[in-house]
């Protein structure tokens, strides 16, 4: 076999047996028994094989569905606490993908969708749980904010745009998008403004719930590949939303009062009433675990919408101890992330235990939950991250309680074991 452009024996002009180009039009012409192939055709064949392998690999990976125990273990690696919610989510997600895997109904039994409603305070981990599950399953994931959604035809974002975002995440591969997870945050903000239907249109409340109904339950949504109203002439993609898992989340502030009111009905009033002491009163998190569909209706969600979210999981408010764990224990804990950033400069970053407690205490006082931790850590380390790339010889930075309280700067330790504050003071 040869790869020369000339045929020394006959002087005959040779052509690629695949594309027909002559030996003078290509860089290489590889000879076989009565056959020739050029370098361009070889490269094209390699590209085709690579694409086919890329398409087959994800399918092979997705053949094995993680069990609820495996899903829960993955959540434990990234999310602290919320044990009950993790178990509920793991089972619901497992059942959803089991339903997709065995699409043909057995004995005429068609399995319903297990869309999920997460109820819990801000910063308790609702979004992180949904994101981590999608990452664990290697499926497309997108988020939407319910407060920005409006009915079609009104100023704002159409509910169909949610599917548009999901398609963008997987390069408009409809098959992949139909296995995706959509997380809709602030779902409590689209509750009806009152129990009585209003004469005027509630385009960002009940109207959005109505618009989301079919999308969540399952419909074939026609989605333009390049966005909504701007390209009416282009061909639409057909996406079956019955295969997409929808997870809705919200803080539902005040829902505990609705639950308490329902629970106390019939418990007696006046002298016959049972009076609970301070210690007997349930916490807000404990009260929320008793939520029933009727409570959500009274809160302002329409019955049809609640019916599309059969799986309900409540998350507890994170205490100071949990926030300390969140700072240091998960695989992608904040302290580990910032340590990695400092390591890129050749500097070791150390957070002392009293510093972690002080950061958690500050987040608790701000009532931001885990969501507020990053901004606190960022503000503590800002000046140090600004200075370190320009300072030679720093091998370690230490953060203690006084740094978090703003009383001092992080301690910098140099190669010759001398230590000084990041500000340059001895």
Curated annotation (Swiss-Prot):
Zn(2+) binds at residues 16, 19, 38, 41. Gene3D superfamilies: 1.10.8.60, ClpX chaperone, C4-type zinc finger domain, P-loop containing nucleotide triphosphate hydrolases. One of its GO terms (biological process) is proteolysis involved in protein catabolic process. GO terms for molecular function: ATP binding; ATP hydrolysis activity; ATP-dependent protein folding chaperone; protein dimerization activity; unfolded protein binding; zinc ion binding. Pfam families: AAA_2, ClpB_D2-small, zf-C4_ClpX. GO terms for cellular component: HslUV protease complex. The keyword Metal-binding applies. The keyword Membrane does not apply. It comes from the Bacteria. SUPFAM superfamilies: Glucocorticoid receptor-like (DNA-binding domain) (SSF57716), P-loop containing nucleoside triphosphate hydrolases (SSF52540). Keywords: ATP-binding, Chaperone, Metal-binding, Nucleotide-binding, Zinc. Residues 4-57 form the ClpX-type ZB domain. ATP binds at residues 121-128. Belongs to the ClpX chaperone family. HAMAP family: ClpX. Component of the ClpX-ClpP complex. Forms a hexameric ring that, in the presence of ATP, binds to fourteen ClpP subunits assembled into a disk-like structure with a central cavity, resembling the structure of eukaryotic proteasomes. ATP-dependent specificity component of the Clp protease. It directs the protease to specific substrates. Can perform chaperone functions in the absence of ClpP. This is ATP-dependent Clp protease ATP-binding subunit ClpX. It comes from Shewanella baltica (strain OS155 / ATCC BAA-1091).
């Amino acid at each position: 076999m040869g790869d020369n452009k000339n045929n020394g024996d006959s002087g005959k002009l040779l052509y690629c047996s695949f594309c027909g180009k002559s030996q003078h039009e290509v860089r290489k012409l590889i000879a076989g028994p009565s056959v020739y192939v050029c370098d361009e055709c070889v490269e094209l064949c390699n590209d085709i094989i690579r694409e086919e392998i890329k398409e087959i690999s994800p399918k092979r990976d997705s053949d094995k569905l993680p069990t609820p125990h495996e899903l829960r273990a993955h959540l434990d690696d990234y999310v602290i606490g919320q044990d009950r919610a993790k178990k509920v989510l793991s089972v619901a997600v497992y059942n959803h993908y089991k339903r997709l895997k065995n699409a043909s109904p057995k004995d005429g039994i068609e399995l319903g969708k297990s869309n999920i409603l997460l109820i819990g305070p801000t910063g308790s981990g609702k979004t992180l749980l949904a994101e981590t599950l999608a990452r664990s399953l290697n499926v497309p994931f997108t988020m939407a904010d319910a407060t920005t959604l409006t009915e079609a035809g009104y100023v704002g974002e159409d509910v169909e745009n949610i599917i548009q975002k999901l398609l963008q995440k997987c390069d408009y591969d409809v098959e992949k998008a139909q296995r995706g997870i959509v997380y809709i945050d602030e779902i409590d903000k689209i509750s009806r403004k009152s129990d009585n239907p209003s004469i005027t249109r509630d385009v960002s409340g009940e109207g959005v719930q109505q618009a989301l109904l079919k999308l969540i339950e399952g419909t074939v949504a026609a989605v333009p590949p390049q966005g909504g109203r701007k390209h009416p002439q282009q061909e639409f993609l057909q996406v079956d939303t019955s295969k997409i898992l929808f997870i809705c989340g919200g803080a539902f502030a005040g829902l505990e009062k609705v639950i308490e009111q329902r629970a106390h009905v019939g418990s007696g009033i006046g002298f016959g009433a049972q009076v609970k002491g301070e210690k007997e009163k349930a916490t807000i998190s404990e009260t929320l675990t008793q939520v029933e569909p009727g409570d959500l209706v009274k809160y302002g969600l329409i019955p049809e919408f609640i019916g599309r979210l059969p799986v309900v999981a409540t998350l507890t408010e994170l205490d100071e101890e949990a926030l300390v764990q969140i700072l240091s224990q998960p695989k992608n804990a904040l302290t580990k992330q910032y340590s990695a950033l400092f390591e890129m400069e050749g500097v070791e970053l150390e957070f002392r235990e009293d510093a972690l407690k002080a950061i958690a205490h500050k987040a608790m006082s701000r009532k931001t939950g885990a969501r507020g931790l990053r901004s606190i850590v960022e503000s503590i380390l800002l000046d140090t991250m600004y200075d370190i790339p320009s300072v030679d010889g720093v091998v370690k930075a230490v953060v203690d309680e006084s740094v978090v309280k703003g009383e001092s700067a992080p301690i910098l330790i140099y190669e010759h074991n001398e230590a000084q504050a990041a500000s340059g003071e001895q």
